[in-house]
Amino acid sequence: MLTAQRVGFYLPSCALSSYSSQVYPVLFRFGSLLIPSYGALAALGVLTGLLLVQRTARVVGVSPQQMWNLSVLSLFVALAGSRVLLIAVNWSLLRMHPGWLLGLAMVHHPLLAAVGAALAIGAAACFTRWQHMRWDATADAAAPALAIGFAFEQIGALLSGAGFGTPANVPWAVTYADPLAERWSGAPVGVAVHPVQIYCALAYFAIASVLLYWLPRRQQQGDIAGAWLVATGAVVFFTEIWRDRVGRGEIFEKFLDGPQIAAILLVLVGAYLLRRRTAAAISGAVVIAGAGNE
């Protein structure tokens, strides 16, 4: 039986210390059982995204059941594939500590996210082709849900210390007090840092709101997906300015890091998609006008 002494509940403190508020990597504690903040918020983001994509699928004319199957398949492939890579890279350590396998789902790293995203895109492409789904309409339906999911994931990252920010001397800075934040994510304990994850989360919520408003009013298929790619790339690129770069890869004499390179690619792909769709619409309008003149 659980007692008040054996149950801990952790959330960001609303009270500010001299410079910052504290955040914690453990959301719930039931005796020796820990519920990590990152895993709980990421799961909430997945659930919210799955529920939302059922509604957006109807708006774009895609079967909600097909969209559900596509989403679940992509999530499974992304998680399983990235964890297999993690096991392969750390096989010698995991052989000595097999119990660590239970915590692999909670590990967060930009490389794992990139591998998971690539695998998910591949799985989604195969599924849409197999099910004869329109890829542009499917991408439009998925975009707002992905933005919502990323927002919750970033809130979880804030609480756990994953992707922590650079040292800051601002009233809204956060400080990690739990040693688990350092052990799990490498976050500095006792140092006030930028809550860069909240910057991202707020931006993603704003993107999702705009896309949901725009979705039923879009002029052509693919507009929402293209806009999401451009906006997401811009958010990632600029928020990396306040994110600690340890373990994120750097090129051009530390001018850019790995996520910023990925962000540039997202913007380019999104811009190409929007330009291609716009060019096609203009071409169609010219053909129609020419036929009318005849």
Task: Give residue ranges: language-model regions.
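A feature for loop-to-transmembrane-helix boundaries and adjacent hydrophobic helices
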Residues: 9-294
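Cationic, low-complexity basic patches in intrinsically disordered or flexible, solvent-exposed regions
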Residues: 6
